[in-house]
Amino acid sequence: MKIYITGLPSGYEVEHLVRLFYPMAPLTLTPPENAEDCVWAEKTPDGLHTLVRQDGRSAERHAPLPAPVEQGGETPEFSLASLTYDLLRDWTGIRPPWGKMTGVRPVRLIHDKRAAGWTEAEIDHFFLDRFDCSQQKYQMAKAIADLQEPILKVGNEPGTYSLYIGIPFCPSRCSYCSFVSCNLDRDRKMVQPYVDCLCREVEEIRIQADKAGLKLCSIYIGGGTPTSLSADQLRQLMGTVRANFDLSKVVEYTVEAGRPDCTDAEKLAVIKEYGATRISINPQTFSDEVLAGIGRKHSAQDILDCYAEARKAGHDDINMDLIAGLPGDTVESFERSLRQAIALDPENITVHTLTLKRASRIVIEDQKENDYADVAAMLEKCRLLAEAGYRPYYLYRQKNTLQNLENVGWCKPGHEGYYNIYIMEEVQTILSAGAGGSTKLVTDGGKRMQRIFNFKYPNEYIQRFAEVLERKKGVADFYDHDLGTQTSG
């Protein structure tokens, strides 16, 4: 299936709506005559036209041009996208659970509409009618927005920020992963120079944050796999964090312990000793067959042993990640994994839906969406989490996620992950250290934003580290400008 879009300066919205029905369909700029197996959306001086052809059959829809936006009309792009959506919904018999929504932050939309003074009835209409969102998904997003409100008040306090520290090393690469990460065995010589630079960048972040008058709210050490570092390297990094920041005033300090094949009792003890209040142990599945298929070099029993060691080390706020839709998984196997996670009784369980990233091995090897299990049926099993006393506290979506579904963090009451909420709802400055880091500077509740990017690859980050430090000066410059804007005139 191919996508053709003509007559619009940008076909972004149409393209992504078509991919709700045909996830890997390529966009082709010049349609041939008598194109087959395609979706063709076009704006002409006469109106809007959309056509689908597949397996020798075809259907089409037409509509007049919308009224100008200043007169209350929709943009031509949204109108053409909506026309195409209606055609494909009828053609395929599929109603995407999030309707026409292609954005990654539906909960943020609810917060924004409320802040703008919309009534609950107006927000209901926006989701359910204008975007054809299902009642189930909308009610979940709305419940999450309600739960987040008091937490966002903490993150919205003027001058607060969170610190992200990235460790781009893994013992092996999972088949679904597209993140920039280095194989630990191949790139081990790079690890210590990387940690040395990382510690220096953390120190520079503290200097720039102090100059800007910022107060640290939460810390997140992620990856990659942070526990691919040695115990001594973890001590070096976390010792630098402790030496530069008052951890007693931090509401949350998370370290991704990640994979049991590189997480041992000593590392878990170091993480606890140096101030982390929350860790994540990520099985993804408790099926040994599925683990082997995605390239994990450990067993389900290794996960259970790692979890027991974490409890023994005193960790009392643990998240576990599961992924719905992994190659070779089934609804029944996913349910067993979910029940196993619930039986362990962690404070958080996060359920991700597999996303087909173009740089991941499962896409490069040309596996199709039909190769995957019924992911919607898997996510239906998350009712077991609610029955066990967990509640959803954050939600986000990604492009090319199987069956247009979502990722949801579930928690026991009082164990909401603050950093996850802050980064998803974009209400707080995030200062990022490490290769691939993206610092996001935010003021006025997200109305003004600026990004500062680190170099993407670890070797480039190390070799051009002086430039990394120079770019970090943009933090204080951003807030100097903001202060000057507020006090001038």
Q: Where are the regions that the model predicts?
A:
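Radical SAM enzyme core and accessory elements
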Residues: 1-108, 112-116, 120, 129, ...
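A C-terminal junction/extension of Radical SAM enzymes
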Residues: 34-36, 355, 359-433
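Short beta-strand motif preference
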Residues: 50-52, 165, 279-281
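N-terminal [4Fe-4S]-dependent radical SAM core
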Residues: 88-95, 115-163
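Key residue(s) within conserved catalytic/signature motifs
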Residues: 143-147, 176, 255
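Canonical Radical SAM [4Fe-4S] cluster-binding loop centered on the CxxxCxxC motif
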Residues: 158-195
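Beta-strand scaffold of nucleotide-dependent catalytic cores
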Residues: 166, 280, 348-352, 421, ...
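Conserved non-cysteine loop/helix-boundary elements of the Radical SAM core domain that shape
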Residues: 181-380
